[in-house]
């Protein structure tokens, strides 16, 4: 039961409350709070402060609100227009993205623009322009938090701008002021965009005077490296031996993989891996275990085998199930073969002896080895025995006071056996000369200790990667090789220590490395404020990290970026991905997922590309694209010697003529290219024989292949793909490919040709393809000084002067303060001199900021917010929204008008309403219709008439 009648009355349920509230714009935003239904009742209409005048008309202190209270703010007149008594229009479902503007948790609260605040700002700023006669702009909330697309604020159209001007202004003056308004509006948007993004790394890499130079030099270094690799393959005939046809997919993939191996620093020995059958890589790492905190305990290890005894038994004891070290793709049935690899070696050799009859000498060596082991065990000194006993005592104490003491007795017995076997294995590598071994052992374990300590710092994250050299050696699967390496000390005494620890890197060096295969992780969300160094700092904690690639931001994704992290092939990429998903950067979830390998690396294009006429056109386009890209990155710019020839070459390239291909560039791929650009036709023969092209146009002609032209085209296509990352047959560029997981991943090749093709199809294809490649054929020319001046370019000296004036403050007469240093001076000229002498770095920052902003303006393809839909596309009839003079249309269901009480019912949105100025002209005089009247001759003299 309620506490009082008022409380009971307040909580009474109104069935249609939500339906009525949705019609009123001032209640729509706060109709339903986020905090659930408990707090929502306090926000109902009875507590609305704007309803005071309507609810205080009678009754007690609290009365049940009448239905008349829901019809709008203000007191209703007794006798109103019948139009106001009409039932409200049907409530339409709001568009997607409308409604409450809240921060999107997907983007971590990042919204540098606060577009709703900007819309409110511009609405208040233009309040003089948009009075009651003008409806709000269409979809003003398109830039709000509920939408993924940010836009500029809506700009006033000419009709709205006229309302802000004087009545007696001339038409030419109106157009001049409106042009100035549009220019200022554009300047303001560019400046706001620059201020919002100038501190972000991707923006600095594009336009900052220092960072952009470093980035361009880095990219040029990548291109130079790719050019060297291509020229090496071009000279040894690898490029000329392959055709860019989908039927030769294997040969194309081999060429691309060869380039990748060369780019990774591989040798000719590593190229042999391409001849081997691809197989799953062996990963030297632990299997997935429950996450546990490992306490780093520093111990002195006498030999590398100690790492097995002191690091491995603890996980075996603590874990609820035995999970020894082994490769990921190893069989689960052989889980116990790797722990005692040294002790089981005799068994393996005996098994091999039963299979191979040639293994008898190995048995003899094995017997010798056993006798040596017995002698070593008997000749150990007291220090080694005491050390082993102390270590076993410590392990017993740890086992006794272990936190997880609920292990089964069988597991404890097995763990005890493992420790006993490990202590025996610890003594095996020692040679009879103990002094020499001990002297060498004191130097080696230090490196191992450092490795163990660094690994155990982040054991929860790097658990799949923790693996030491001895463990990797036992996992190698080829036990005979291991034993052969261990038997070498008997031949040479000087190499005793080197053979005790088998270096896995040396073993790998003997085999070709598959440098073209990697593992990678895809990051779906990267806030613009996250830098590359922060991502690298996180990834460096995992073994096998190679590089990271970050894409350019997109306005459709609120300037969020995507990223790719590349690791070596033999890592457990799923464990690393799990570790990355448990971390956040700048309160942003990166959304890490495992990036799959490429499914189809060679993809077919239209088969008409093999036709002779199309091939000749493609050669021309490829040569022009190669020239533009080479000139853009200055790949072959240092070789030309004759200034006159280079000048003529530049003029011809600017004019777009292809007559100088091969002359204005020292690129060997473009040499003598003009010989293949001249078309040939047997016109005389066709004329004499009376052959016409009508049959060809109707029936078509078979595909004509010219192998010589195709070989020239393939050379150009591979040059663009390998050097400039341009996939010609896909008419696109693969950006930042040198940082991606697959450096030369995908290529499009000519597909199966059709049987016949018409001349019309060929011409349409050539024209269409040239249109698609227009982005590569046209040069990007920066804007001139005059053009950027119109966009609001800044002057360095002017900005420095403003900086000096801003840091010159007058405290009293002959007393001035410099805020930068806090010192006081007698005059402003002394502060100016002080700033240029003591704060020169601040002045340089101002000059760099000016150059930074001007570089942004010079880019014709600069990133910026798209225009508001209301600015770019105006509705056909603005009077439908109450925007113009005249009468409103009938109130059909999709009607959306201004709130009641703003003017006469059927007039144009308050033209003769109370507290509003009288109606004014809204169009220039030449667009207005002059009212023509007539004079009745029979009417009296004082009658009304029009001029």
Curated annotation (Swiss-Prot):
Residues carrying Phosphothreonine: 300
Biased composition (Low complexity): 646-657
Residues modified as Phosphotyrosine: 79
GO cellular component terms, A-Z: nuclear body; nucleoplasm
Keywords, in A-Z order: Nucleus, Phosphoprotein, RNA-mediated gene silencing
UniProt feature, compositional bias: Polar residues: 465-479
Biological process, per Gene Ontology: primary miRNA processing; regulatory ncRNA-mediated post-transcriptional gene silencing
Biased composition (Basic and acidic residues): 8-33, 40-49, 345-366, 393-427
Region span, Disordered: 1-100, 300-492, 643-666, 855-892
Residue ranges, compositional bias (Basic residues): 367-376
Residues found modified as Phosphoserine: 81, 303, 330, 354, 357, 431, 644, 646
InterPro entries (alphabetical): SE/Ars2 (IPR039727), SERRATE/Ars2_C (IPR007042), SERRATE/Ars2_N (IPR021933)
Subcellular location: Nucleus
Acidic residues: bias regions: 330-341
Pfam families to which the protein is assigned, alphabetical: ARS2, SERRATE_Ars2_N
Domain of life (superkingdom): Eukaryota
Assembly mode: Interacts with cbp20, Dcr-2 and pasha.
Function: Acts as a mediator between the cap-binding complex (CBC) and RNA-mediated gene silencing (RNAi). Involved in innate immunity via the short interfering RNAs (siRNAs) processing machinery by restricting the viral RNA production. Also involved microRNA (miRNA)-mediated silencing by contributing to the stability and delivery of primary miRNA transcripts to the primary miRNA processing complex containing drosha and pasha.
Protein family membership: Belongs to the ARS2 family.
Name recorded for this polypeptide: Serrate RNA effector molecule homolog
Organism: Drosophila simulans (Fruit fly)
Gene field: Ars2
């Amino acid at each position: 039961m309620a506490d009082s009648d008022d409380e009971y009355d307040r909580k009474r349920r109104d069935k249609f409350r939500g339906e009525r509230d949705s019609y009123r714009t001032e209640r729509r935003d706060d109709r339903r709070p986020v905090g659930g239904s408990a707090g929502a009742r306090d926000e109902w209409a009875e507590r609305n402060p704007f309803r005071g005048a309507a609810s205080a008309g009678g009754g007690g202190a609290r009365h049940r609100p009448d239905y008349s209270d829901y019809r709008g703010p203000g007191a209703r007149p007794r006798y109103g227009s019948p139009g106001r008594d009409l039932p409200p229009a049907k409530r339409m479902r709001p568009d997607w993205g409308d409604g409450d503007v809240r921060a999107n948790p997907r983007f971590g609260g990042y919204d540098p623009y606060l577009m709703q605040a900007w819309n409110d700002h511009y609405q208040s700023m233009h309040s003089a322009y948009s009075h009651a006669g003008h409806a709000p702009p269409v979809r003003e909330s398109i830039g709000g938090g509920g939408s993924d697309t940010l836009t500029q604020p809506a700009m006033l159209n000419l009709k709205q701008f006229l309302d802000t001007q004087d009545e007696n202004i001339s038409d030419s003056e109106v157009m001049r002021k409106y042009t100035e308004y549009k220019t200022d509006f554009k300047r303001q948007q560019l400046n706001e965009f620059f201020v919002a993004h100038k501190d972000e790394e991707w923006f600095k890499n594009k336009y900052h005077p220092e960072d952009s130079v470093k980035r361009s030099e880095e990219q040029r270094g990548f291109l130079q490296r790719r050019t060297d690799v291509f020229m090496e393959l071009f000279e040894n005939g690898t490029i000329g031996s392959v055709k860019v046809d989908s039927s030769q997919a294997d040969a194309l993939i081999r060429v691309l993989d060869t380039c990748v191996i060369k780019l990774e620093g591989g040798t000719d020995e590593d190229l042999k891996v391409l001849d081997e059958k691809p197989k799953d890589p062996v990963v030297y790492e632990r299997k997935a275990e429950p996450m546990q905190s490992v306490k780093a305990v520093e111990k002195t290890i006498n030999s590398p085998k100690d790492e097995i005894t002191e690091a491995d038994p603890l996980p075996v004891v603590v874990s609820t199930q035995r999970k020894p070290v082994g490769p990921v793709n190893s069989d689960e049935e052989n889980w116990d073969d790797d722990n005692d690899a040294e002790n089981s070696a005799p068994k393996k050799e005996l098994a091999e002896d039963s299979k191979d009859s040639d293994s008898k000498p190995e048995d003899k060596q094995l017997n010798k080895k056993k006798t040596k082991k017995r002698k070593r065990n008997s000749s150990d000194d007291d220090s080694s025995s005491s050390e082993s006993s102390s270590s076993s005592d410590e392990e017993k104490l740890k086992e006794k006071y272990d936190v997880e003491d609920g292990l089964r007795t069988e597991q404890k017995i097995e763990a005890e056996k493992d420790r006993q076997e490990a202590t025996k294995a610890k003594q095996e590598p020692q040679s009879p000369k103990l002094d020499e071994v001990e002297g060498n052992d004191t130097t080696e374990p230090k490196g191992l200790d450092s490795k163990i300590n660094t690994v155990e710092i982040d054991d929860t994250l790097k658990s799949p990667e923790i693996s030491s050299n001895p463990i990797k050696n036992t996992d190698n699967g080829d036990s005979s090789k291991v034993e052969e390496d261990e038997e070498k000390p008997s031949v040479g005494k000087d190499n005793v220590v080197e053979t005790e620890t088998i270096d896995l890197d040396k073993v790998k060096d003997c085999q070709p490395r598959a440098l073209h295969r990697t593992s990678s992780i895809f990051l779906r969300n990267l806030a613009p404020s996250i830098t590359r160094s922060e991502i690298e700092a996180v990834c460096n904690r995992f073994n096998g990290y190679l590089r990271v690639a970050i894409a350019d931001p997109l306005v459709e994704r609120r300037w969020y970026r995507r990223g790719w992290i590349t690791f070596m092939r033999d890592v457990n990429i799923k464990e690393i991905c799990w570790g990355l998903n448990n971390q956040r950067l700048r309160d942003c979830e990166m959304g890490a997922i495992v990036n799959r390998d490429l499914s189809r690396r060679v993809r077919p294009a239209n088969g008409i590309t093999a036709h002779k006429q199309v091939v000749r056109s493609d050669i021309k386009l490829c040569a022009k694209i190669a020239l533009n890209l080479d000139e853009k990155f200055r790949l072959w710019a240092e070789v030309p010697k004759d200034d006159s020839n280079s000048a003529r070459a530049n003029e011809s390239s600017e004019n777009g003529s292809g007559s100088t291909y091969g002359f204005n560039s020292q690129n060997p791929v473009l040499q003598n290219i003009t010989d293949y650009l001249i078309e040939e036709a047997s016109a005389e023969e066709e004329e004499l024989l009376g052959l016409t092209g009508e049959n060809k146009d109707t029936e078509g002609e078979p595909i004509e292949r010219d192998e010589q032209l195709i070989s020239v085209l393939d050379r150009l296509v591979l040059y663009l793909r390998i050097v400039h990352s341009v996939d010609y047959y896909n008419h696109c560029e693969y950006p930042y490919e040198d940082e991606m997981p697959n450096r030369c991943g995908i290529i499009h090749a000519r597909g199966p040709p059709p049987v016949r093709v018409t001349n019309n199809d060929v011409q349409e294809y050539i024209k269409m393809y040239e249109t698609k490649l227009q982005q590569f054929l046209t040069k990007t020319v920066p804007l001139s000084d005059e053009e950027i001046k119109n966009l609001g370019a800044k002057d360095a000296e002017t900005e420095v002067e403003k900086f000096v004036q801003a840091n010159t403050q007058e405290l009293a007469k002959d007393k001035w303060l410099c805020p930068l240093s806090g010192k006081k001076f007698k005059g402003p000229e002394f502060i100016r001199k002080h700033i240029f002498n003591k704060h020169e770095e601040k002045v340089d920052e101002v000059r760099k900021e000016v150059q930074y902003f001007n570089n942004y303006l010079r880019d014709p393809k600069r990133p910026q917010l798209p225009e508001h839909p209301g600015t770019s596309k105006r509705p056909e009839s603005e009077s439908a929204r109450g925007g113009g003079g005249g009468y409103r249309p009938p109130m059909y269901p999709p009607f959306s008008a201004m709130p009641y009480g703003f003017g006469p019912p059927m007039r144009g949105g308050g033209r003769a309403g109370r507290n509003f100025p009288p109606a004014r002209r809204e169009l220039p005089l030449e667009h207005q219709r002059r009212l023509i009247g007539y004079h009745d001759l029979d009417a009296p003299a004082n009658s009304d008439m029009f001029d």
